[in-house]
């Protein structure tokens, strides 16, 4: 199995570099499989959104497609699946990953009101912290 960096995923998803795309495609077809870390998926979403200006629906489809390949091995697969579902429902992807990775008994605590609202709409345990002592 090989582990892939963000730029390999971006090459496959954007087809933006004709000299690197064939090698990137071969990597995704690696017979022993390929590993994708949460941080790689997080950075890939950011690159597709910030640098390529792709819409959320296209980014979600692209990330889901890569994660759904039969030879893909994902770091904390369940967390990534939850984060992708929450992202599709409107949550920020980084926030969705933070929430998915938070297995605290009393939820994720934040000062971010938008995160609390979006997460609670999805039934996630995210709580607003008070800045008052």
Go through each PLM region and give its residues.
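Short, well-structured N-terminal submotif of metal-dependent ribonuclease cores
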Residues: 1-36, 51-61, 122-133
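Short beta-strand scaffold positions
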Residues: 4, 36, 74-75, 93, ...
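Acidic, PIN/NYN-like endoribonuclease modules and their adjacent C-terminal/linker elements
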Residues: 1, 69, 100, 104-133
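Acidic catalytic patch
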Residues: 38, 42, 60-88
